[in-house]
A protein has these predicted regions:
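Long, highly charged, low-complexity intrinsically disordered interaction regions
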Residues: 2-81
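Short, compositionally biased low-complexity segments
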Residues: 32, 100-101
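Structured, non-catalytic alpha/beta "coupling" segments that mediate domain-domain communication
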Residues: 88, 93-99
Length: 115
């Protein structure tokens, strides 16, 4: 198993903050400081033998360029990404469905107020 490297950044208060994985970065700095790859790695949760979650997330973003590029892809297409299996794909699909429902609710509320 690869040793996690400690990473450092300065938070909004000017304090030095360290973490070893994307979840630690999110907790210590906030989600807005995380890259798309780091957020996706958090959703993926764990890696596969020889491939950490961060690397799997990088491969997904490389394949689809962005979250927007991933949105309407059939679930079957994600199986071609090394390290992605059913549970990880289900987590990603669930996260995208949650985001879609949030957007739909915001649009619905906005349209309701404008009429």
């Amino acid at each position: 198993m690869a040793k996690e490297i400690e990473k450092t950044a300065i938070n909004k208060e000017g304090e030095r903050v360290t973490w070893r994985h994307p979840g630690g970065k999110l907790l210590r700095l906030g989600p807005e400081y995380c890259t798309d790859e780091e957020l996706l790695a958090i959703i993926i949760s764990s890696g596969s033998p020889g491939m950490p979650a961060e690397k799997i997330a990088e491969e997904i973003i490389k394949e689809y360029q962005s979250f927007k590029g991933m949105v309407n892809q059939p679930i079957e297409k994600f199986y071609k990404i090394k390290g992605l299996k059913q549970v990880k794909i289900i987590r990603i699909a669930a996260a995208f469905e949650i985001a879609r429902r949030i957007v739909n609710q915001i649009v619905k509320e906005k349209n309701g107020k404008n009429t």
